[in-house]
């Protein structure tokens, strides 16, 4: 009996598995479903005929077979509803895309690809060009180094300039234009090799012409002498004709005698005006009240007892004033930054050596101070010097790719980049003081820029900080280091950067 029951249970299970396999291999027409239903009915009849021996076992077998057939049919229906039709052959093809180049004929696309390869070669030439510019900057920075050293010595009272060095170089207090320089240069240039022999021959001819010119002058004088000879003849005829002319002639002779008297009067007039002016000045001095004179005497007596003010050494607060007058750096400098920046003695610019990645570094030199232990604070800007296929306008100029700062070794309680706040918590019923460190706005945040992640993007706030940081590096590189004196005097105003703010296209690109 046990063997018969096992056979009765196993047969409908096998039929159910067969039905599932048939349902999975059916087509969209649904003919296989009909065959599966007919097979299930035959299996039900066979199972009922085989179990006619015992009533209890036959009842259990029929119930199991009917439940198995019902479950498989419901599964096949659900599977049929969820089935997705296969894509057609046209849909299986790779999409051409909506790009303009993808819609071109294959022959034209091949030619465009050849042009792209040529453009890659042009970008390689541009990299060499930018590296050559960097080498030129490094070369001329060495020529400027002795001039920067003299500037450093004057600012820090290590050298006192002479009177000649303190005088303005130009006579008209304006730089001469290029045309004026070109007009003056030929006179200073030595003669060329081919012109040395010709010049001596031309000089005697010029001298001969110069000698001939004064010979003509005496001829003119002879003509002038002949004119007065004719005048007495006319006068003689007039005397013979009438006596009235005789009376008129002596009056003409008297005029030359009066001429020297008129000249003497003209000479005496400026002397008289000068004497009047001097007298007016003397009267003005006499009109000064006696009280003012006494006040001036009292001030002189008071100053005798006080020591004279000593002249400041060097140029105090030079770089502080320079940085405050820079368009982007000025708003960054807070009041608590100014006492620290008064110890700033020099700002220099150094370029990377040949063979190294293209970059330049700013060095901020500080005198010993009670705020931090660093003598030099460094900020390095790395320049993009390799072509990028994502940037088609690589050759437009320098582009800052990344920047690196340095760690400031602050003394205890002197860090101005953070503020410490104390918050009291009363959760346990006791008063506890927990210090919290909060970032603070400061110029010295310039030396700790946000790092650019290798993967992903920066936050919008950090991205804006980097953009502004790169602009500051550009301004320091182009103008401030080379022409710091114009920032100190305030001759460079804010409108200067409205036209050259994005000079060189040095902008951070995501």
Curated annotation (Swiss-Prot):
The keyword Nucleus applies. It is found in: Nucleus. Residues 35-74 have a biased composition (Low complexity). Residues 1-99, 161-311 are annotated as: Disordered. Residues 161-182 have a biased composition (Acidic residues). Coiled coil: none annotated. GO terms for cellular component: nucleus. Residues 200-229, 235-246, 254-300 have a biased composition (Basic and acidic residues). Pfam families: NAP. It comes from the Eukaryota. Its main location: nucleus. Keywords: Nucleus. InterPro entries: NAP-like_sf, NAP_family. PANTHER family: TESTIS-SPECIFIC Y-ENCODED PROTEIN. Belongs to the nucleosome assembly protein (NAP) family. This is Nucleosome assembly protein 1-like 3. The lineage of its organism: Eukaryota, Metazoa, Chordata, Craniata, Vertebrata. The gene is NAP1L3.
